[in-house]
């Protein structure tokens, strides 16, 4: 099985070819570049449909694999505009919502740092509802709160949501 066939199908976003490669036993965990990216990681970055993630998990996608930046598929998906539904599939498969990359950042940090974080409130809600820790410090000593303070209105939103979450416990 030529791993390049799967990557060519992924680059073309040709779902029929992708399914053919998966059914033929393509290795979704084999790194395809010097940065340690796997086809499964690529799908987590580029495909936003939960069904695509499920297909790669069925093909034994490694939920805890890490690239050279120490990113796991969940963190990659969160960084790249994934929906709460896609993130839920990864969490159900065993992803660590608080996993940190080599810079110490979590998925929650990347979502808050996103230039359009206020447009991603559903994803922020998902992270809060699923126990993402806003107090984890990265290698610069910053937390979600530090990055939220840089975005108009985001700190207030997070405070209200986290207080609501705590009052439900």
Stretches with model-predicted labels:
Residues 8-13, 42-49, 76-83, 110-119, ...:
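Ankyrin repeat A-helix N-terminal signature
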Residues 113, 123-126:
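A structural signal for the main folded, soluble domain(s) of proteins
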Residues 20-27, 54-62, 88-96, 125-133, ...:
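Ankyrin repeat domain, specifically the short helix-to-loop turn at the C-terminus of the second helix
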Residues 133-168:
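Leucine-rich solenoid repeat scaffolds
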Residues 1-24, 29, 33-37, 44-45, ...:
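Intrinsically disordered, low-complexity regulatory segments in ankyrin-centric signaling systems
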Residues 17, 51-52, 85-86, 119, ...:
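Conserved ankyrin/ankyrin-like repeat signature
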Residues 66-90:
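Eukaryotic tandem repeat interaction scaffolds
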Residues 1-8, 31-41, 66-74, 100-112, ...:
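Ankyrin-repeat boundary/"N-cap" motif
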